[in-house]
């Protein structure tokens, strides 16, 4: 049985700031169902350790690394049979607040480099069998900058396992000062532009890109995009150089957590073959959010209120859509000026526009089920999960044709009626977004056309089964001595 160590900085339901947490829960479980022994490595955040203690788990080993006392806990990811290892270092990971990266004022923890440097060191020690555990991986799968130093620390070991590094969002690179590089005690040989130096800064993510045996990202389109100056965040040249090792594998979703036929967050359930209760979900959502219960088109948005998610474009189209009678249900948090602009919109349009700041898992499900149209006008989107959730729930998405949105949403102007499941705009402007929403609203008026779009979306396969199989093929080929995904 192939053993995989899946190193991540967040995993649902223990800690979540975005899609990484969902992937880190569902992909390892899918790999286990394929017969892999996939175990997760996670920093020992308070919520994770609390869950471990409540489950009766215990420390497996305790040691000192440099100035830090470290313990390793073995437990299970809640609700699954997947083994979860927790790196318990109170000095670095016992922090207040819900975010693993920021304090309660929204500022990055000053010692994030030290925190995830230690996480990388412990990951490498576990991978090399140096912690006295009766388990050692054949593959170490690292995710985003927080675990990107693990391949660096394994590079000089002759018997190190193969490494895979997945880019979930290239915009987050783990950049720190040269002084921090020195403080971490990293060897001077790594301070070179072809290794960890990036325009005078230490780049954690370059560790994964330069030293891993294979690189993946979360959609085929994003794999192409990040090799261009427009999406490469200064690393496009390196990624073009590594293109033979770079693979775009589309994310899946947990189709048990996201299932309109049995969703515990919904009062009414429905499916592709019996869609009637979707309107009941909408009425309940309108009541919950203080919106008028009527037949008006309801547009939903769930995500971070930041420029990347196209909030400036969205703000440019909300008012004219409200004026024509549309309703909005918005859930998220982010930049202060976007929050204030949306609050003003809610005050101006009571009963028609709702904003819930923060993140609420249950409400996210209810918006996904209750809306007619789901908006994802992202400037860039490595994969995106919300559009797949909305498709599965028969809520027709309107998206910007980038990254994984381009790979999962198919416009009737570009595809056959049998394939079309949403609306795509290509030009990066508010006018293009407005035009796509207008087309969606027009389609909604034609019941047969709308029902076909919903049906196509709901019957799509968004599960991890095939996507996990692509990772499994990559693992097998790495162990066999090459980094191809598809076997001959």
UniProtKB/Swiss-Prot annotation:
Binding site for ADP-alpha-D-glucose: 16
This protein's pathway: Glycan biosynthesis; glycogen biosynthesis
A GO term, aspect molecular function: alpha-1,4-glucan glucosyltransferase (ADP-glucose donor) activity
Catalyzed reactions per annotation: [(1->4)-alpha-D-glucosyl](n) + ADP-alpha-D-glucose = [(1->4)-alpha-D-glucosyl](n+1) + ADP + H(+)
Coiled coil spans: none
Keywords, comma-separated and alphabetical: Glycogen biosynthesis, Glycosyltransferase, Transferase
Gene Ontology biological-process annotations: glycogen biosynthetic process
Keyword Glycosyltransferase set for record: yes
Stretch forming the signal peptide: none
Gene3D superfamilies: Glycogen Phosphorylase B
Enzyme Commission code: 2.4.1.21
Tree of life domain: Bacteria
Any GO CC annotation of this UniProt entry: cytosol
Pfam families xref list: Glyco_transf_5, Glycos_transf_1
Record function comment: Synthesizes alpha-1,4-glucan chains using ADP-glucose.
PANTHER family: ALPHA AMYLASE DOMAIN-CONTAINING PROTEIN, GRANULE-BOUND STARCH SYNTHASE 1, CHLOROPLASTIC/AMYLOPLASTIC
Family (UniProt): Belongs to the glycosyltransferase 1 family. Bacterial/plant glycogen synthase subfamily.
HAMAP family found in the cross-reference section: Glycogen_synth
Protein name stated in the entry: Glycogen synthase
Gene name of the encoded protein: glgA
């Amino acid at each position: 049985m192939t053993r995989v160590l899946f190193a991540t900085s967040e995993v649902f339901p223990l800690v979540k700031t975005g899609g990484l947490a969902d992937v880190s829960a569902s992909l390892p479980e899918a790999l286990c169902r394929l017969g892999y022994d996939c175990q997760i490595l996670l920093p020992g955040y308070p919520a994770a350790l609390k869950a471990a203690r409540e489950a009766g788990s215990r420390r497996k080993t305790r040691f000192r690394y440099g100035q830090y006392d470290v313990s390793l806990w073995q437990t299970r990811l809640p609700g699954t049979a997947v083994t979860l290892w927790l790196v318990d270092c109170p000095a670095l990971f016992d922090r207040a607040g819900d975010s693993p990266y920021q304090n309660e004022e929204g500022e990055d923890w000053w010692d994030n480099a030290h925190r995830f440097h230690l996480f990388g060191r412990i990951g490498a020690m576990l991978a090399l069998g140096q912690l006295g555990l009766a388990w050692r991986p054949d593959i170490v799968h690292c995710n985003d900058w927080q675990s990107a130093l693990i391949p660096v620390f394994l590079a000089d070991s002759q018997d190190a396992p193969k490494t895979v590094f997945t880019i979930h969002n290239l915009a987050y690179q783990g950049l720190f000062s040269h002084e921090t590089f020195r403080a971490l005690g990293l060897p001077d040989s790594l301070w070179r532009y072809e290794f960890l130096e990036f325009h005078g800064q230490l780049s954690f993510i370059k560790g994964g890109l330069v030293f891993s045996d294979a690189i993946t990202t979360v959609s085929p389109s994003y794999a192409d995009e990040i090799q261009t100056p427009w999406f490469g965040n200064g690393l496009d040249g390196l990624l073009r150089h590594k293109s033979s090792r770079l693979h775009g594998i589309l994310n899946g979703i947990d189709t048990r957590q996201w299932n309109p036929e049995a969703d515990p967050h919904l009062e009414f359930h429905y499916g592709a073959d019996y869609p009637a209760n979707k309107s009941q979900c909408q009425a309940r959502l309108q009541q919950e959010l203080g919106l008028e219960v009527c037949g008006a088109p309801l547009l939903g948005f769930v995500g971070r209120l930041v420029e990347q998610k196209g909030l400036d474009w969205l703000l440019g189209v909300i008012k004219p859509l409200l004026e024509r009678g549309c309703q909005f249900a918005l859930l998220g948090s982010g930049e202060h000026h976007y929050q204030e602009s949306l609050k003003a919109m809610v005050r101006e349009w009571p009963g028609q526009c709702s904003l819930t700041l923060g993140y609420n898992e249950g409400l996210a499900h209810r918006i996904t089920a209750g809306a007619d149209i789901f908006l994802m006008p992202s400037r860039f989107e490595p994969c995106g999960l919300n559009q797949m959730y909305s498709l599965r729930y028969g809520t027709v998405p309107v998206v910007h044709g980038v990254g994984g949105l381009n790979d999962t949403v198919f416009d009737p102007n570009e595809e056959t009626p049998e394939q079309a499941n949403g609306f795509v705009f290509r030009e990066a402007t508010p006018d293009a977004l407005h035009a796509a929403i207008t087309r969606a609203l027009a389609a909604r008026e034609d019941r047969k056309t709308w029902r076909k779009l919903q049906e196509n979306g709901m019957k799509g396969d968004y599960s991890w089964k095939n996507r996990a199989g692509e990772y499994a093929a990559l693992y097998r080929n790495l162990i066999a001595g090459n980094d191809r995904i598809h076997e001959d």
